[in-house]
Amino acid sequence: MALRFPRFSQGLAQDPTTRRIWFGIATAHDFESHDDITEERLYQNIFASHFGQLAIIFLWTSGNLFHVAWQGNFESWVQDPLHVRPIAHAIWDPHFGQPAVEAFTRGGALGPVNIAYSGVYQWWYTIGLRTNEDLYTGALFLLFLSSISLTAGWLHLQPKWKPSVSWFKNAESRLNHHLSGLFGVSSLAWTGHLVHVAIPGSRGEYVRWNNFLDVLPHPQGLGPLFTGQWNLYAQNPDSSSHLFGTSQGAGTAILTLLGGFHPQTQSLWLTDIAHHHLAIAFIFLVAGHMYRTNFGIGHSMKDLLEAHIPPGGRLGRGHKGLYDTINNSIHFQLGLALASLGVITSLVAQHMYSLPAYAFIAQDFTTQAALYTHHQYIAGFIMTGAFAHGAIFFIRDYNPEQNEDNVLARMLDHKEAIISHLSWASLFLGFHTLGLYVHNDVMLAFGTPEKQILIEPIFAQWIQSAHGKTSYGFDVLLSSTNGPAFNAGRSIWLPGWLNAINENSNSLFLTIGPGDFLVHHAIALGLHTTTLILVKGALDARGSKLMPDKKDFGYSFPCDGPGRGGTCDISAWDAFYLAVFWMLNTIGWVTFYWHWKHITLWQGNVSQFNESSTYLMGWLRDYLWLNSSQLINGYNPFGMNSLSVWAWMFLFGHLVWATGFMFLISWRGYWQELIETLAWAHERTPLANLIRWRDKPVALSIVQARLVGLAHFSVGYIFTYAAFLIASTSGKFG
């Protein structure tokens, strides 16, 4: 008999039902569960798949460059970044006739196009690209990298090139390679690009391979570096009247600490950015050389962790046993990596708008909104994934003997205290925040808005003042002109920073009031509840009072059969599943808050946010309803407009989102009955009954149906908000 799918599991391949297909897809990437898997093959498979991932990323970014070069308007955008709308790519086949063609022909294009809200134009412009030829060259280079990655992936699956397990578990060498080799060297290389290409480009000098060796990035060359007069590289920076991309008002400095923003582009000074990357490179190059590799010098990670025993005794045996636990568990390592990446992605969202690095991106409001929202959602999914793999670690990889009385074991020992504290925090935040909102709603409903409970966020305002914001009148730290902090920075970065933080047209340290106080606590509620569900799922993954042998059932199980009531919905997977809803909920509040506050800031009517954000009806009426008018008007009796596609996506997103509930509410029995009825009808219908299947149709398991429901809910939720965000912002600001 021919090998049936899935080849990695003979047990599943012989299953006579459609379960074979669905379980096969579900476990395709769970290499640990495959037949004949060894630890060595597991590591090699994962390692090789990383190269495939890199190849896809390079191919995708190459496609971005290629399509903009081919169908975009990069060269005309470069001439006037503030008024030309950047084109992402052409629309091949515009449906709905002539009105659609006219509606989508914009940005100086000859036919229908999509506008780019990704910020790539601003990024490419800032790093020194100027022509379509530059874009094509970049696309070809990335295509080359993509094919190299694919080749490397294939190569590392060949017997001669397969690394051994000991190579994968050599933690110090991996740290050396990642910290120094990847982060350190790439940061240094990026500094080099900024200094040699981007900064001259911002001063109107076009540096390419043909003149790269002739153009000195700094008039004094490498002299100051070798004589130790590094401060010369910071002298004569660009002036405040500098026109980006030209020599008008340009200086000669390459590494500065000016602080604040370039007045024309409203983005960080490129010379400050180069300085930052050089510092990062230095730190990582040093960090990567601190651990003992082939030369017998430096720290051993194992020795470090074994020595970490707090003397007070309150943390037991401290970090003893952690080295082997982490180094032998791929899930623990993945959990750590995802947690770090999730935090970084959220930080990227926060910093991209408050400290924009790319020229003119701060004035492209739709792009700012899209990038913030995109990065926050990505961060949410990555963070929940971190806890999922943390739970899988506890089920598959945790060894109690190896971790006796260390910090990991102690987390499990006092999990009741952790979970109940999180529960208490969530309840406190939820009841008090909702109570304040609802009280304010009632006061407005009865026509007595002056009876609202409005709380000034004085602690947050004090923190903003400490960073130099003067409008609140706190005379503290950087907002006090006679303190040591103020005097220390006055000659370098401080004037630029103070100018930026007290300027009302950017997004740096926005003025906050009672509406911000309330939504801050609503978001805190969402964060604590999401954390509660995820932490409980991981800490109870091995077992609980209700089900002490839970770890024997694996990561996801629906229920444990008759006679053990209450064991439904308590697998670690169920906790992850529930937490994703709360994560989406929380990021909804975060993005609503960000978007509404910024819309009013950009339109110059900040009072709308300040007055309406203190009660729920204000959010529903003055943010959601008021800003969805563009979507509801996307097509009307007078034909189409350029927002029609978003109006359609808004409806379609709602549809996908609502479909999720169908899977979330009706469970396995319903689908099984439905499928059997459909199969019966199929077999008795002429022509249709000529098509037969080998597998007996079986409904999805409860766990799978929940996954399908969750996927529809998440995708629909994000599609709906993406359409709302882009249409309402671009409808106002073009």
From Swiss-Prot:
Q: Name one GO biological process term.
A: photosynthesis
Q: Where in the cell is it found?
A: Plastid, Chloroplast thylakoid membrane
Q: Where does chlorophyll a B3 bind?
A: 662, 670
Which residues hold phylloquinone? 671
Which of this chain's residues are annotated to bind chlorophyll a B1?
Answer: 654
Q: How is the cofactor bound?
A: P700 is a chlorophyll a/chlorophyll a' dimer, A0 is one or more chlorophyll a, A1 is one or both phylloquinones and FX is a shared 4Fe-4S iron-sulfur center.
Which Pfam families does this UniProt record tie to the protein? Answer: PsaA_PsaB
Q: Does the keyword Iron apply?
A: yes
Q: Give the transmembrane ranges.
A: 46-69, 135-158, 175-199, 273-291, 330-353, 369-395, 417-439, 517-535, 575-596, 643-665, 707-727
Q: What keywords are annotated for this sequence in UniProt?
A: 4Fe-4S, Chlorophyll, Chloroplast, Chromophore, Electron transport, Iron, Iron-sulfur, Magnesium, Membrane, Metal-binding, Oxidoreductase, Photosynthesis, Photosystem I, Plastid, Thylakoid, Transmembrane, Transmembrane helix, Transport
- A Gene Ontology molecular function term of the record: 4 iron, 4 sulfur cluster binding
- SUPFAM superfamilies linked: Photosystem I subunits PsaA/PsaB
Membrane topology of the entry = Multi-pass membrane protein
Which Gene Ontology cellular component annotation is one that this UniProt entry carries?
photosystem I
Keyword DNA repair belongs to the record: no
EC number(s) stated in the UniProt entry for this protein: 1.97.1.12
Q: According to its UniProt entry, what is the function of this protein?
A: PsaA and PsaB bind P700, the primary electron donor of photosystem I (PSI), as well as the electron acceptors A0, A1 and FX. PSI is a plastocyanin-ferredoxin oxidoreductase, converting photonic excitation into a charge separation, which transfers an electron from the donor P700 chlorophyll pair to the spectroscopically characterized acceptors A0, A1, FX, FA and FB in turn. Oxidized P700 is reduced on the lumenal side of the thylakoid membrane by plastocyanin.
State the oligomer form and interacting partners: The PsaA/B heterodimer binds the P700 chlorophyll special pair and subsequent electron acceptors. PSI consists of a core antenna complex that captures photons, and an electron transfer chain that converts photonic excitation into a charge separation. The eukaryotic PSI reaction center is composed of at least 11 subunits.
Quote the PANTHER family the UniProt record gives: OUTER MEMBRANE PROTEIN, OMPA-RELATED, PHOTOSYSTEM I P700 CHLOROPHYLL A APOPROTEIN A1-RELATED
The record's comment on protein family reads: Belongs to the PsaA/PsaB family.
Kindly provide the name given to this protein in its UniProt entry. Answer: Photosystem I P700 chlorophyll a apoprotein A2
Natural source organism: Buxus microphylla
Q: What is the lineage of its organism?
A: Eukaryota, Viridiplantae, Streptophyta, Embryophyta, Tracheophyta
